[in-house]
Design a protein with these regions (language model features):
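GST-like fold's C-terminal all-alpha helical module
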Residues: 4-98
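Acidic/histidine-enriched, glycine/proline-rich intrinsically disordered or flexible terminal extensions
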Residues: 109-129
């Protein structure tokens, strides 16, 4: 479980976070930088998709690895990503999104923000807006 938690904290989180920043918040559009982070996200998604091949959750049973990874992967579109080639990830996201605790978590107002408002706040945080 720790290995997959660290996979999220050292891989998916930072790479997808940077993809989000350069795609939506950074004042200049730098296509090569955006593509670099998106490509790394896709590489990490391939690893995650393979891990989920014969499992309902990342480590078999639901764990902190799922709790940490889900919020990032659930917002894949924000990073300009698609998951059409990752059927195991799609199925995992569906299972997570159907769990009562995940549903309750997603009802938190922080997840209800308007994307444009989030972009405005993000740009302000990095000095771009």
């Amino acid at each position: 479980v720790l290995q997959w938690l660290f996979f999220q904290t050292s891989g998916i989180g930072p790479m997808q976070g940077q993809s989000n920043v350069f795609l939506e918040y950074f004042p200049e559009k730098l296509p090569s930088v955006i593509k670099r982070y998106q490509n790394e996200c896709i590489r990490l998604y391939r690893v995650l998709n393979k891990q989920l091949e014969d499992k309902e959750y990342i480590c078999g049973d639901i764990s902190i690895a799922d709790f940490a990874t889900f919020p990032w992967v659930n917002l894949y579109k924000w990073a300009g990503l698609e998951i059409t080639d990752f059927s195991n990830i799609k199925n995992w996201l569906q299972r997570c999104n159907e769990r009562p605790a995940f549903i309750k978590g997603l009802e938190n107002p922080i997840w209800k923000n308007n994307k444009q408002e989030d972009i405005r706040i993000g740009k302000k945080m990095i000095g771009g807006g």
